[in-house]
Structures are given as C-alpha cells and as structure tokens.
C-alpha cells in the first residue's frame, strides 16, 4: 500500500477557486486504450472524488504477487501424482496405501506430492506396526536423571499413544504455528472421531515447493496439546547413505538434513499501469509501477534444541539472516523466534510442548535428563549403543537421532583434528559451503554436511551460517550439554561437548 493525493479545482469567472470533481481511468497498454476497470492486481484505488483546493489523501494497494520458481525440485513436486481427496485425505501414518488404519506415527511427516493429507493425534512414534509402542515413552530405568515416563503438556506421564485418551487432553482445534513458504499447507482442520480424530490439511499444486510447516492441536482454552512438523520435499529420504565410523560400526544416514530445502530463486515480473485523472477538460497521467525483483535463498533447514521434538525456523542459507516465514494469518516475517525462560526438568519439557515456536533461553535446556532422545540411555559418554527412539524425537517414520559415535569416521583419529590430512573429506567452497565427508576408508563415496551455523538460545538469532556446522546426536554430555559434530573449514570435532543443550543445531537422522 502506498499513499497518493489528488488536488482538483478550477477558477470561476470571478477568480474564485472552486472544487472540481474528478475521475480516473486505467491503461495497461501504455495509453493505447483506457478503461474504467482497474487491473486485477491493483486491489484498491479511489477512482473519483469531489476535488478541492488542498490535496486529498488516498491509498493505492496491490495484491501479493506470485513469483515464478524455476527450481527442478518445485517442478518435480508439482508434477507428482496428487494424493487423497478432500473427503478422503491420505493418511500419513499409513505407509502402505494412505488408508484409514494407523500404522506408524512420528513427529515429522514427509509430503512429496500435492493433495489432501491427514494424520492421527498420536504422541510422536507411540504407534509402531499398528500397535502401541510403549518403549517410545516408558523405560524401566529410574533415577533423578532419567525420565521414566515421558510427559505430555500437563506434566503427567503419557498413558496412551492417542492424545485424547490421556487425562486432561481434549482436542478442540488445529492451527498452523508457522510455515516457511506462503500457502505451503492450507485448509488445516481438526476432525473429531475415534481415538480423538485427526488433523487434515491441503498442499496445493499451485503453491507446492520444498518447505516446512508446524501444525498444532489445541484444546478449547487454546493450550497446545502437541504439534507436528510437515516437511515438503521431493528428496527420497529412503536413499540412505551408509557411513562407517571410526569404531567400524555402520549407520544408514539420511541423505540430507532434517527439513532440508535446496537453493531456490523466485522472480517477480514488473507490474505497471497508467492512471489518467480527468476533471472537466483537463487531464493528467501518472504511472503506478511495481518493479521486478528476485529472491534468492541457499540450502537451508530448521534448527533443534537438544532433546526437543519441534523444529525452529531456518536461516535463508545466505548469511545470518532468517528465512521468510508465515504465521497462521498469512503474515510474513523475518523475525527471530521468541525466547523465554522455560525453567528446567518437567517444567521445561511442558513448555517445550506448549510453546513449539519459542526457544528455551536458559543455556542448560532441560538441565535434567539423559534419555530424552534415547529412552533407555543412562550414560553421558559417546558410544554405539542402540538408540531407542522416543516421542520427543523430531525424525520422520523409520528414522531416529543417531548415537554419539556416528560421526567419528569423519577424521582418521576418531577425534578432534585441525590437521587437514586427518580429515576424511574435502571442503566445498562453492556457494553452499560444507564438508563432503568420505563414508568409509575406501574414499569412494561421500556424504555432504552443509555449514549451516546455529540458532542462539538467548535471542533466537542465527549465527555462523556458511562458516561452521553443528549437528546433534542422541547422546547427552554431562548436564547441561550434549554430544554433537562440529566443523569449520579448518577443523572437525566429531565428539564435541562444548556447547549447551539450548543452542539450536541441525539434525541428520539415521535409519532405525
């Protein structure tokens, strides 16, 4: 919206200035022809007035322009066969055929085609192979550093996979929390039914592209009961890459970061029209012009605080700048996530659930538990012990956070090094910076890890984009830290523990 003003008057035979009524017409062919109908993209423009000797203010408003995206990933998504219908959405928890039976659930669902989708109101991976997966939220281990029964938004232990079957959990409405592509997911609905019903949404063929969204289920008091990550991508995440670590243990790693979106350039054509103001025999022409533009983003992904299930918004991949995101009203922003003191322990985890788009600003994170991302874990050392996926794991179906030792093969020593010959890989200094790490000692295949920086806990800002990489593992370090992969162009630390749980890092999941 931009202001404009009109001054329209005439002098009568006595030299007195009088208001002269005026009208406006439009031309989109540079004045060859004129019409009383304004162009469709000019959504508000006052086309007549009574006139006056002083300027009368008005506003001209244009519609949001849809850009042209020539990305091959967008083309692939648009050309994919649509799934589901408005009446029968494709059930994302049914990996067989999208039918009504809930088979396997997760906190993240991957969408690779336009269509109508749904998912049940289930805590994370609490359903597995059509049955209750109690090991996702209960362990026989006890102790002050062990969460024996994982909790929900009320602070009570989860007693049933289906949210509505837990005391004090009554779903009432579904709502978008944020999305990083305009209209990526639309028509979000809560549908009451057995076991609490489901959430459905639409991914339109016209607006589909790689992107991320978070959808929450709320009660009648507007409390978030749980939330889920929708990752739209054409990437076949099942094309895993086998990585052998320093201990000679093999892991099948997701080919890209969780929530990854590739480089993209969106262009916006110029829009213009002439406006002719006429009062009596006099006229004047002006041009309304919206200049052409292009928006470039580099590869990007959401960030995660250790032990937490919900993604925090990405950078734009170019610098320490946020990717544009959209709230439930469609309002765009590049602001940082809000931050808040979530306290610690059970209170912290409750707040993680209740406020999925707010960062814990206390450096220690939960400051309590060793098993948030591996339910039976009791130790603070990096190892190759099996990770038992929990309801707080952010990974999609079939994937989980990797164990602490997963990245040790990225150096010849299994540990920290600043000696280039001891780094098993080559640094990419192209527009998308990062390490192409060798997957084993044969050096015949690589896996790429972008230097995508981190999100700082105290103010939510992104930092170190294109210079450093940080990737969480499921392994805690002595409270309040966690084990993670760190690298720059000159150094690789596969077992770093110097940062705190509340910092937002990337996640590279491994296959279950």
Could you describe each region identified by the protein language model?
Residues 1-187, 241-281:
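Solvent-exposed, low-complexity, repeat-rich "mucin-like" stalks and linkers
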Residues 60-61, 69-75, 116-189, 290-387:
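Long, low-complexity, polar/charged, intrinsically disordered or flexibly structured peripheral segments
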Residues 188-192, 222-224:
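Mobile, glycine-rich extracellular loop/lid and propeptide segments
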Residues 194-210:
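Extracellular/luminal low-complexity segments enriched in Ser/Thr/Pro
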Residues 209-220:
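A short beta-strand micro-motif common to beta-rich folds, especially ectodomain repeats
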Residues 221-227, 232:
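Short, exposed coil/turn segments at beta-strand boundaries within extracellular/luminal domains
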Residues 233-322, 364-365, 371-373:
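An acidic-aromatic substrate-binding cleft motif
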Residues 344-346, 350-512:
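C-terminal, surface-exposed recognition/capping segments
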């Amino acid at each position: 919206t931009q202001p404009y003003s009109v001054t329209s008057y005439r002098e009568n035979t006595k030299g007195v200035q009088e208001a002269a009524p005026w009208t406006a017409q439009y031309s989109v062919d540079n004045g060859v022809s004129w019409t009383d109908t304004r162009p469709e993209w000019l959504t508000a423009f006052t086309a007549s007035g009574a006139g006056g000797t002083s300027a009368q203010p008005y506003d001209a408003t244009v519609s949001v322009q849809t850009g042209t995206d020539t990305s091959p990933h967008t083309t692939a998504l648009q050309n994919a066969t649509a799934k589901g219908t408005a009446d029968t959405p494709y059930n994302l928890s049914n990996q067989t055929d999208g039918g009504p039976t809930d088979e396997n659930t997760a906190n993240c669902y991957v969408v690779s085609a336009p269509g109508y989708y749904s998912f049940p109101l289930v805590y994370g991976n609490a359903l597995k192979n059509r049955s209750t997966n109690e090991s996702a939220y209960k362990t026989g281990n006890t102790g002050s550093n062990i969460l024996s029964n994982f909790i929900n938004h009320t602070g009570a232990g989860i007693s049933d996979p289906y949210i509505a079957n837990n005391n004090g959990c009554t779903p009432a409405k579904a709502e978008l929390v944020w999305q990083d592509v305009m209209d990526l997911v639309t028509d979000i609905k809560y549908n009451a039914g057995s076991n609490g019903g489901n959430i459905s949404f639409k991914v339109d063929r016209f607006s589909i592209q790689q992107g991320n969204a978070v959808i929450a289920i709320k009660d009648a008091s507007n409390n978030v009961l749980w939330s889920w990550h929708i990752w739209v991508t054409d990437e076949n995440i099942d094309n895993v890459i086998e990585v052998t670590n320093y201990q000679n243990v093999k892991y099948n790693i997701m080919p890209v970061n969780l929530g990854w979106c590739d480089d993209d350039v969106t262009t916006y054509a110029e829009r213009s029209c002439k406006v002719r103001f006429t009062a009596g025999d006099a006229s004047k022409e002006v041009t309304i012009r919206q200049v052409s533009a292009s928006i470039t983003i580099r590869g990007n992904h959401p960030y995660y605080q250790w032990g937490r299930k919900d993604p925090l918004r990405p950078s734009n991949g170019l610098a320490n700048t946020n990717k544009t995101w959209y709230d439930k009203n469609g309002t765009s922003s590049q602001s940082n996530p809000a931050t808040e003191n979530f306290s610690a322990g059970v209170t912290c985890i409750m707040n993680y659930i209740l406020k999925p788009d707010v960062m814990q600003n206390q450096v220690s994170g939960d400051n309590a538990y060793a098993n948030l991302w591996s339910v039976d874990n009791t130790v603070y050392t990096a190892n190759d012990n099996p990770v038992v996926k929990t309801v707080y794991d952010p990974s999609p179906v079939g994937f989980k956070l990797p164990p602490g030792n997963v990245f040790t093969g990225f150096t010849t020593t299994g540990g920290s090094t600043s000696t280039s010959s001891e780094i098993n890989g080559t640094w990419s200094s192209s527009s998308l910076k990062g390490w192409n790490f060798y997957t084993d000692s044969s050096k015949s295949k690589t896996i790429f890890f972008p230097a995508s920086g981190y999100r700082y806990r105290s103010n939510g800002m992104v930092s170190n984009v294109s210079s450093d990489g940080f990737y969480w593992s499921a392994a805690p370090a002595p409270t309040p830290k966690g084990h993670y992969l760190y690298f720059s162009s000159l150094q690789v630390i596969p077992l770093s523990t110097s940062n705190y749980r509340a910092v937002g890092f990337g996640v590279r999941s491994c296959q279950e």
